[in-house]
Amino acid sequence: RSTKISDNSPSSGIVIRWNDCEQTIDGFGIAQAGWAKELFAFKNRKQVMDKMFGNDGLRLNILRGEIFPHYWENKEDKDFNLNDDINIELCDSDFNNKSDDLLRRGQLWLTLEAKNKYHINKLVFSTWSAPAWMKSNGKVSNGKLKPECYQDFANYLAAFYKAYKSKGITPYAISPSNEPGYAAPWNSSLWTADEMGKFITSNLGPTFQKENIPAKIIFGENPLWSVVMPQLKMVSSKDFTDTILQDYPEIKKFNLIAAGHGYSLSPDIMPIKVDKEYLKTPIIPFDAAEKAHIPVWITEISDVTPLDTSIQDGLKWAVTFHNYLTKANVNAIIWWGGAM
């Protein structure tokens, strides 16, 4: 139906197609993850939470956290530190520390607040790195998961689910790897599509089934949505998810979410001069996931440039979100980060 806005307005119209059904929208959210301690220590943290999740705020319905590598610090350690005190007075000197302990407490407080006060039920958690003792280099940055620790890692993720559920904060989805193609200097772990396909089909998926864990398994989550330049395929989410679904068709029997991140490339970061056309990251569908009726989420997107609160920047992001919804057919969008 076409409707004229007013007698004085330019000739325009809005057409509503009631019977054109597109993808289901699972929601919109923010990631806090490694920034949980900053929000936990902020004196106006409750006002910030209201702005993000409250009825008078953005009314977001997804929160993305991290499965930290410092929960199980050795093979005998099975503690997720969920009995730590989170009711610390904001004037407490503990908030001056930048410790793993404060990060764990911060995420626990944030997740409980999101669930209990704002009734957020889409709580998703990504893993930047497995515990160091499971890694090829014995560190939480770079390296790979040792093949002999694949089942240990699957057990770790299952135990995390059960531990958080015991606190009334049931994870909706779990990702075994954040940005598997990027060896970041912070918590990180490299995976090929073949390694991830094997791990999910042989270890994580069967473990979740055996333990009756209904959480969805997120896979993909590379820094770029898609690429034009073949040499960049290792950081392309579309290539990563397409390869897994093609080479491991049995993976489709599990409860999955195919995901990607929406960062862009600048010629300035390339070691050699590259034409801008080759650095494009097209916003296109994940065809293999769509064909298999697997939801597609963008689990991280942001801007690496300085903060810009202008309407011009706001409109730029409105167009970007619109393109992901209408061109890539995503089911959810998560912004990095909620409060930094």
How should each PLM-predicted stretch be described?
Residues S11-P171, T192-D194, S202:
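N-terminal catalytic cores of secreted or lumenal carbohydrate-active enzymes
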Residues T24-Q32, L60-I67, K122-T127, Y172-P176, ...:
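Structural recognition of the beta-strand scaffold that forms the well-ordered cores
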Residues A33-K37, I67-W72, S129-W133, S177-A183, ...:
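Solvent-exposed loop/turn segments at secondary-structure junctions
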Residues A41-N55, F153-A163, M229-P249, G314-N323:
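Short, acidic/polar
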Residues K98-R104, W109, P214-I217, K252-P306, ...:
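Glycoside hydrolase catalytic-domain groove-lining segments
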Residues A132-I244, S264-I283, A288:
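Active-site cleft segment of glycoside hydrolase catalytic domains centered on the general acid/base Glu
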Residues I298-M340:
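Aromatic/acidic polysaccharide-binding cleft in carbohydrate-active enzymes
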